[in-house]
Amino acid sequence: MKKQNNLRSLAAQAVEQVVEQGQSLSNVLPPLQQKVADKDKALLQELCFGVLRTLSQLEWLINKLMSRPMTGKQRTVHYLIMVGFYQLLYTRVPPHAALAETVEGAVAIKRPQLKGLINGVLRQFQRQQETLLNEFATSDARFLHPGWLVKRLQNAYPTQWQRIIDANNQRPPMWLRVNRTHHTRDGWLGLLEDAGMKGYPHPDYPDAVRLETPAPVHALPGFAEGWVTVQDASAQGCAVFLAPQNGEHILDLCAAPGGKTSHILEVAPEADVLAVDIDEQRLSRVYDNLKRLGMKATVKQGDGRYPAQWCGEQQFDRILLDAPCSATGVIRRHPDIKWLRRDRDIAELAQLQAEILDAVWPRLKPGGTLVYATCSVLPEENRDQIKTFLQRTPDAALSETGTPDQPGQQNLPGGEEGDGFFYAKLIKK
């Protein structure tokens, strides 16, 4: 069993890999969790997610309390001090334990000579905490978002940007999707209650259930048997707008990790579904999801810009394009997004989205439906993207979602407690 004081150093290393090396926390965290006892996995996750959620504040505090930054091989200590601040500010770890374990973390990262420095900075913070937090409350860092993203949100949502930022800074609820081929939603809610848990149905998405309190999946009735899947309510809107029917040929493009593929098959079990994604590693999760749910689909690796490479001349009755995007609508669920994205990424993503739309549109049958979806809240990837697509595509018409001047439906994070999501339903004339 690993010593618990390794948790702080592991959390510091994880955050450093995200911020300094641009790695996704979902890739960094699992191997680190293998290094700690089962009872400590939740705390390690809390420290990593929490530090990334509040990184602006923790960085601001370090700049106030240290005369010069830690650089080079000492850089991990910079993030170790952040882990200490986070514990003192946001967790129920007793302050004396937070200090002691964080200071000991210096030994684990082979910087024992800096134990005194870490201890001194954390104790100085304790002494000045009230004054520092009052000053922080009026600083630009208080939004806990990078400045470029704050500006984009202010421009796009002059009256709602603060609400979006506040929602992004909250912990996300746990949403589930009841597999209608096994149970009705009300029937499964009864099983959940029998298991001592409570859930609430979504008013618009017929399979969605929000847990009153998040729970491990193995505690959910029938999870292993495929009765229920973890999926945010807003993501479930994709299949609602797509409205798949049995017997149809359906393309799920950019399909990994397969949550929407399986939802399509739950709604239309006799549909012929092709799931395509460019990332071969992530496609393994599509197979895993289909296997757990006992479903079958054709799964291929491919680039959405070149459909001839993965489907020849085949045409489809319905296409779901869950386009690659900035993921600015799911920041509360993936706080590392704030520090992985750059302002310049948005134009590049919008260009990629346009190329995929143009490439895949000819593969839709006349009278067919294409649902364009993103987990972004930025208009360049959403409303503006569809507006320009409609202008250059005479045989495309908007259906159900918005108007030609304001196309699509934009869900903001926290609305009905779902993530930020955009949908545009297009019909081929």
Swiss-Prot record:
It holds the Pfam family NusB. Its EC number is 2.1.1.176. The active site is at C375 (nucleophile). GO terms for biological process: regulation of DNA-templated transcription; rRNA base methylation. Keywords: Cytoplasm, Methyltransferase, RNA-binding, rRNA processing, S-adenosyl-L-methionine, Transferase. S-adenosyl-L-methionine binds at C254, A255, A256, P257, G258, G259, K260, D277, D303, D322. It catalyses: cytidine(967) in 16S rRNA + S-adenosyl-L-methionine = 5-methylcytidine(967) in 16S rRNA + S-adenosyl-L-homocysteine + H(+). GO terms for cellular component: cytosol. HAMAP family: 16SrRNA_methyltr_B (MF_01856). Belongs to the class I-like SAM-binding methyltransferase superfamily. RsmB/NOP family. This is Ribosomal RNA small subunit methyltransferase B. It comes from Salmonella schwarzengrund (strain CVM19633). The lineage of its organism: Bacteria, Pseudomonadati, Pseudomonadota, Gammaproteobacteria, Enterobacterales. The gene is rsmB.
